[in-house]
């Protein structure tokens, strides 16, 4: 029976060693999966973010200040949320007025409804300026 106990003790040790090696094997799996993707020639869809634009605005406002990647992620989520709210409101306005198209007028009204007070006024003026610049060029 002592001989039976010793192999029983060794098996947990043997089980622990592969358990430690599993994360390494796990790291190798994505490489194998990536190789599989290369064989299929499936291109990865580019994730669209506003990070470069947020950074450009930050440098215009505060050239000496940086931003962490976590804060950048939060800002990107914030922009996505605001745009989603504006799109939903503009869509609702177009539906109410039985219009098939969302125009700059619907966007402007959505901005006035979604954004509070002074922020809405500034957003409308900047939006009007951008549309004028776009149509003139």
Curated annotation (Swiss-Prot):
Q: Report where it is expressed, by tissue.
A: Ubiquitous. Highest level in shoots, fruits and young flower buds, including petals, anthers and ovules.
Transmembrane helix in keyword set: no
Modified positions (N6-acetyllysine) are: 27-28
Basic and acidic residues bias (residue ranges): 1-37
Name its cellular compartments: Nucleus; Chromosome
Cellular component GO terms, alphabetical? nucleosome; nucleus
Record-linked SMART domains: H2B
Q: Where is this region: Disordered?
A: 1-45
Q: How is it modified after translation?
A: Can be acetylated to formH2BK33ac and H2BK34ac.
Q: What is its main location?
A: nucleus
| InterPro entries per the UniProt record, alphabetical | Histone-fold (IPR009072), Histone_H2A/H2B/H3 (IPR007125), Histone_H2B (IPR000558), HISTONE_H2B_site (IPR055333)
| Record location of the Glycyl lysine isopeptide (Lys-Gly) (interchain with G-Cter in ubiquitin) cross-link | 133
Write the signal peptide boundaries: none
Any one GO MF term held by the record is: DNA binding
**Induction pattern:** By gibberellins GA1, GA3, GA4 and GA9.
Known function: Core component of nucleosome. Nucleosomes wrap and compact DNA into chromatin, limiting DNA accessibility to the cellular machineries which require DNA as a template. Histones thereby play a central role in transcription regulation, DNA repair, DNA replication and chromosomal stability. DNA accessibility is regulated via a complex set of post-translational modifications of histones, also called histone code, and nucleosome remodeling.
Family per UniProt? Answer: Belongs to the histone H2B family.
Question: Quaternary structure?
Answer: The nucleosome is a histone octamer containing two molecules each of H2A, H2B, H3 and H4 assembled in one H3-H4 heterotetramer and two H2A-H2B heterodimers. The octamer wraps approximately 147 bp of DNA.
Q: Per its record, how is this protein called by name?
A: Histone H2B.3
The organism is Solanum lycopersicum
Q: What is the lineage of its organism?
A: Eukaryota, Viridiplantae, Streptophyta, Embryophyta, Tracheophyta
